Amino acid sequence: MGRLASRPLLLALLSLALCRGRVVRVPTATLVRVVGTELVIPCNVSDYDGPSEQNFDWSFSSLGSSFVELASTWEVGFPAQLYQERLQRGEILLRRTANDAVELHIKNVQPSDQGHYKCSTPSTDATVQGNYEDTVQVKVLADSLHVGPSARPPPSLSLREGEPFELRCTAASASPLHTHLALLWEVHRGPARRSVLALTHEGRFHPGLGYEQRYHSGDVRLDTVGSDAYRLSVSRALSADQGSYRCIVSEWIAEQGNWQEIQEKAVEVATVVIQPSVLRAAVPKNVSVAEGKELDLTCNITTDRADDVRPEVTWSFSRMPDSTLPGSRVLARLDRDSLVHSSPHVALSHVDARSYHLLVRDVSKENSGYYYCHVSLWAPGHNRSWHKVAEAVSSPAGVGVTWLEPDYQVYLNASKVPGFADDPTELACRVVDTKSGEANVRFTVSWYYRMNRRSDNVVTSELLAVMDGDWTLKYGERSKQRAQDGDFIFSKEHTDTFNFRIQRTTEEDRGNYYCVVSAWTKQRNNSWVKSKDVFSKPVNIFWALEDSVLVVKARQPKPFFAAGNTFEMTCKVSSKNIKSPRYSVLIMAEKPVGDLSSPNETKYIISLDQDSVVKLENWTDASRVDGVVLEKVQEDEFRYRMYQTQVSDAGLYRCMVTAWSPVRGSLWREAATSLSNPIEIDFQTSGPIFNASVHSDTPSVIRGDLIKLFCIITVEGAALDPDDMAFDVSWFAVHSFGLDKAPVLLSSLDRKGIVTTSRRDWKSDLSLERVSVLEFLLQVHGSEDQDFGNYYCSVTPWVKSPTGSWQKEAEIHSKPVFITVKMDVLNAFKYPLLIGVGLSTVIGLLSCLIGYCSSHWCCKKEVQETRRERRRLMSMEMD
């Protein structure tokens, strides 16, 4: 049943698909045009196959029966001979608007062009379907539209602003068809044109841009007079109404449900000239008034308007002789309703019809400037509206206020002058010989700095600080940070004295300083206005710059001594060009030049700062903590002593002295540093010579094995009893193939037999022991990969002197021995292999077990037996 119901739907869709084909369209309704206008007929094609760009052929028939070729988009010889000349002149042309659309344009249509126009398209389809042409009828009407002005030639109207005027034009049509007329009034002023008011073909009014408000107020109107006259009425003319007025009439006809314009005509109606109103405003040019008196200015108006215009007068003030510049302000205003708007100190009065007075009471210096009188004439408009008909601004009236200027002098002197850097500087700026009242005048100061220059170049001044009329101090860029740090201090100790102090004068502060004292006069509104500036003479802050000189001489009172005696050295200091110096001393020792183990080593022993505080620097001999003394003998002399000298103390000793100069508070500034001549300690001995070497029977081991390293000491020269010598032994390692890394201390054994072992980050252990008198054994137990590298020992011998004291010899170092730690490949891979084999076996057995269980229980199929009939054989024997 369902299949039968769907058959009609399928048949309908099939028939629709079969009927679908090319569609050519032109306007369906008859096109009506007027002789002399342009005819445009569009044509388009849709639902076609083939290329996207289609070609079009146009044909014409006056009666609709036989068509003559008119134009083609693809065949040059298609048009008939009758239309070849019009095509060449461009009166007939085809304009493609899209790949599937084209327009036929016929300019200057004539009655002979009335008829039927056919648009056809050549076939590009696989099968011929649809329509390939379409026809539209065109009617050509005679020109029956008549448009003209009310008077010929067009008149020229000369008006003044505010006066009314009217313009008329006639328009009528004798068309046999039902048409509507539309009318537009347009004004031309130079190249620009503006629409004033329009009456559409639907009978609606549309004011032009800028005329909306005047149209709604009734100032601009459009109405008809009789059957064919249209009147434009303007109740009050404006300057913008000047220009040439045109009347543009268009004829419209209903076409395909819409209105189509079929022709348009324009005519010049009149030229309107708006004569500007004469308006001038005059004020006195220069006026002088004493401070505290009244300022009276008169503005006289001259105009040619005698109608009911109303003036609006505004008085404004500016510091500049140009009222258009920013900064001018309005003092008083009299509007067109004779209402005055002003401040309490300003009055505006109307003396007569052409004179207006401005009165400013209690004038002061701030009233000096330029005064302007601004006059506007307003004429009444429609519906109680007003519009401006004239405007004028007077020339400026210069007003000068004479007042008693404060009279005073300014002197600047330096109460403190620096002699060195970091000394304070103090300047005092005094105001003297004042001759004005204290109640109405106050003084402020500005401080300036100018750099010294040897050349004649002009140097600009830099602002240090400026004080406003309310005594608010503002810092300049040069002094802002130092003033915040308290280094620059600006103060006012008395009413007539301003002070500037530099707590710590630097070399950059040298130069010329001057002050500017400003007088401020109190105004009637209790504000203060600057009235005068007086400059002081500059004061030069300068001191000669000389290099600081510091000389240190060291001497040795007892030049000859033996080991175990006391070494004494004194350092004498002399300085120049350093202010109130204090000295800090550092005693330093250098290895002798002949000591090849460390030729550039410098050791700081003891120091004494500028406050006489003693500090041990790198003196690490625990047995001689009190063995060195540094003391201050005089302000410029220091003495260094070293008790119980040893052979290891040999070297060059110097005094490094630093001179310190005091700055603000308890701070000190480093002024200079100098090094003394060296004093040498040299022991001429014929004692033994010690050497150290490292030996290992196992330079290459497997990880986990024991590493043995022997530090062997040999003695050359005089034989010593084993009890007369002892050793401090330290083991170091550089864990790299080269010696590019810093050595790491492993373990040490001092001469008293105390062993110290450094902390390690891996599992191997260290042990250090003395095997014999001259042999020391370092053992690494359970060696790791990190234990590879260069190993060496450092030995410090101690020898007992004949007096029974122990003398420390120079430290010696052995040459390094490289130790390699290898990995045991069999042991490394034994357990991983066993674990892998075991896991593989377990996984294989488990896989077999899973397969067996799956095949036995999950995949077993039930087999049905075929029933067979079993019949016994019958015996063939016959009874």
UniProtKB/Swiss-Prot annotation:
Residues 26-129, 149-268, 276-394, 406-536, 544-662, 688-813 form the Ig-like C2-type domain. The keyword Endoplasmic reticulum applies. It holds the Pfam family V-set. GO terms for biological process: lipid droplet organization; myoblast fusion involved in skeletal muscle regeneration. Keywords: Disulfide bond, Endoplasmic reticulum, Glycoprotein, Golgi apparatus, Immunoglobulin domain, Membrane, Phosphoprotein, Repeat, Signal, Transmembrane, Transmembrane helix. The modification Phosphothreonine is found at T271. PROSITE patterns: IG_LIKE (PS50835). Residues 1-25 form the signal peptide. The keyword Nucleotide-binding does not apply. Interacts with CD9 and CD81. Part of a complex composed of CD9, CD81 and IGSF8. Also seems to interact with CD63, CD82 and CD151. Inhibits the binding of prostaglandin F2-alpha (PGF2-alpha) to its specific FP receptor, by decreasing the receptor number rather than the affinity constant. Functional coupling with the prostaglandin F2-alpha receptor seems to occur. In myoblasts, associates with tetraspanins CD9 and CD81 to prevent myotube fusion during muscle regeneration. This is Prostaglandin F2 receptor negative regulator. It comes from Homo sapiens (Human).
